[in-house]
Amino acid sequence: MTTLAPASAPLRIGPHTVQPPVVLAPMAGITNAPFRTLCREFSGGKGLFVSEMITTRALVERNEKTMQLIHFDASETPRSIQLYGVDPVTVGKAVRMIVEEDLADHIDLNFGCPVPKVTRKGGGSALPYKRPLLRAILREAVAAAGDLPVTIKMRKGIDDDHLTYLDAGRIAVEEGVKAVALHGRTTAQHYGGTADWDAIARLKEHVPEIPVLGNGDIWNADDARRMMRETGCDGVVVGRGCLGRPWLFGDLVGAFEGTGARQAPSLREVAAVMLRHATLLGEWIGDESRGVIDFRKHVAWYLKGFAVGSEMRRKLAVTSSLDELGTQLAGLDLDQPWPDGADGPRGRTSGNNRVALPDGWLKDPYDCAGVGADAELDTSGG
């Protein structure tokens, strides 16, 4: 076993110290309270675990689903919410609501989502192209947040001909943002190809005043340490790498604290985590069957690399109770060891996409006419 040197300095986001400097990326439909609980259990509570995307309009309107999504376990600290919005006024209202009602300790703003339903409204990773709009949103958010730190997560740009991350980073510094996270891909890439870690290094050089976090292609603890070593970034944001692998956060703690401890669970151990995950979802939703149904999306990620036949996978994909799930899992060859090569890419991998944008979006990065509150989404999560 290789012993790794501990990180040289903790990550500081406003008043919060994040050590080791590891952040769970917000993922719609994934990073709800049950999944965050699992990840925190494996990390011993170390790190920062961000909620799935909350739309500012839905929060201000107190949408029922959204109010559930902002629930935090009593032991979660700091409480971290990611907001999505395209209208500065609505974003400001949402942030003030969070502050006045003590709903979170940290606010992250989403400028990285590449999903067409978001970008075609000028939101997510499309928004930083409109520099004045980005500045206005950040100004409103930071002013409304008061002592709560505001951070942003973004991509390199819309495509290779329309890169925005350096301008966006500078605007973030000027408007009082406490840290920036960069996914080293463009919107057009979605999750395809290879993340550009050199861009993360360039951003760190460009905005030395605040922490820069790197995101993209972190599949194991070695990747995280290598990213920090090669880019000089101050921390890492882990997204798809923890799908079906919540114990990755335990590995990350071991790597950054110098123990090098890694988990290689047998299928029996993985099955136990799967059952606990489904149980937590049912408790959180308040309905066992709905919890198990929601868990189905995770099955393939947990079983990646293990020898599980197509018929058994099909059965697991249609389970609707904990008893049924437990019975199906018990029928697997649970003595299988951790498979070689199981730490590779998971989740969506499509790339080279045509980006859905509002008409005329790319004509002028400083023309924000036509972008208004009607572009706000009224639902949160996945």
Give the location of each predicted region.
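Alpha/beta catalytic cores of nucleotide-metabolism and tRNA/nucleoside-modifying enzymes
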Residues: 1-18, 22, 28, 149, ...
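Glycine-rich, positively charged N-terminal anion/phosphate-binding segment
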Residues: 2-12, 27-101
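Residue-level signal for pocket-adjacent positions within structured domains
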Residues: 6-8, 13, 22-25, 48-49, ...
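N-terminal small/glycine-rich loop or linker at the start of catalytic domains
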Residues: 14-21, 57-78, 113-123, 143-156
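Hydrophobic faces of well-ordered beta-strands that scaffold small-molecule active sites
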Residues: 22-25, 49-51, 79-83, 105-107, ...
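Active-site beta-loop-alpha junctions enriched in small/polar residues
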Residues: 27-29, 54-56, 84-86, 112-114, ...
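Short glycine-/acidic-enriched loop or helix-start segments at secondary-structure transitions
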Residues: 34, 60, 93, 118, ...
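Alpha/beta enzyme core
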Residues: 38-41, 92-123, 127, 131-210
